[in-house]
Amino acid sequence: MNKANLLHTDINLKITLFSEVSVGISANSILIFAHLCMLLGENRPKPIDLYIAFFSLTQLMLLITMGLIAVDMFMPWGRWDSTTCQSLIYLHRLLRGLTLSATCLLNVLWTITLSPRSSCLTKFKHKSLQHISCAFLFLCVLYMSFNSHLFISIIAYPNLTLENFMYVTQSCSLIPLSYFRKSMFSIPMAIREALLIGLMALSGGYMVAHLWRHKKQAQHLHRTSLSSKASPEQRATRTIMLLMSFFVVLYILDLVIFHSRMKFKDGSILYGVQIIVSHSYATVSPFVFICTEKRITNFLRSMCGRIVNI
């Protein structure tokens, strides 16, 4: 029997995964609510606020889908049919890919927004949101096509006893693909993800280099009156770098665990750990925005104050 089929017996993994999903859903919901309220309350809303709300919505949908899948992993209330398996697994894989795309494009949009007037990126500022939206839609279509094989490789197979079938949930299993089909889908996905991470690193490096030059110029002009307080641009760049570094570390760790899982024949512990690691970014990233953006912090404080005074 496939070892991952025993995943539902691990209470610690069950508690950890459901806790992660619950916290992530709550944090992303708060972030979406805060940004939507600020967008509705401002005369000229910033494009970055709209995109962060959309970014959080993507992560919220990912965690909700993962929560539904986790229910069938640990406490199945009824066996799913093949259509339910294929739809939920496909949606989950699509949202995971869109999270990578949204993270990359958020870094690019932030870089364009914070770039100085003398930068070559200035010409993209007025239409940056439109360009980012078009790029996201294009990547969405790509992910939908690259993940289409799941509709033929995911089946409802409750009594999993064959070694060549890979466990997904208590109801769903993955049929092994031929080497040609596997390569046909995995190679384009690997290239696309490498390009997105490379673009993310390039945008982060650009902002670090720009702020380093800006700091040197400020030190040259104001050697005797330097302020230790970080500027909004510096705080935003720190947020970018923190999110990007955290995402890349988790992405690499996810790949390492995945290959280890394949090597050790799909062990239940590695499978559970991989699920937790792959959804950690969606849970932690909203807290980074909430803690680093003063506008969100002040808004949440004012909301709490109003609730207390009622």
UniProtKB/Swiss-Prot annotation:
Glycosylation sites: 159
UniProt keyword annotations, A-Z: Cell membrane, Disulfide bond, G-protein coupled receptor, Glycoprotein, Membrane, Pheromone response, Receptor, Transducer, Transmembrane, Transmembrane helix
Extracellular side of membrane: 1-20, 72-93, 156-183, 260-268
Highest rank taxon of the organism: Eukaryota
Transmembrane portions of the chain: 21-41, 51-71, 94-114, 135-155, 184-204, 239-259, 269-289
MF terms in GO: pheromone receptor activity
Compartments where found: Cell membrane
GO biological process, one term: sensory perception of chemical stimulus
Disulfide bonds: 85-172
Topology within the bilayer: Multi-pass membrane protein
Cytoplasmic side: 42-50, 115-134, 205-238, 290-310
Record note on disruption phenotype: Mice lacking all but one V1ra and V1rb gene (12% of the V1r repertoire) show a lack of chemosensory response to a subset of known pheromonal ligands and changes in maternal aggression as well as male reproductive behavior.
GO cellular component, one term: plasma membrane
Membership in a protein family: Belongs to the G-protein coupled receptor 1 family.
Role summary: Putative pheromone receptor implicated in the regulation of social and reproductive behavior.
UniProt-recorded name of the protein: Vomeronasal type-1 receptor 53
Organism (species): Mus musculus (Mouse)
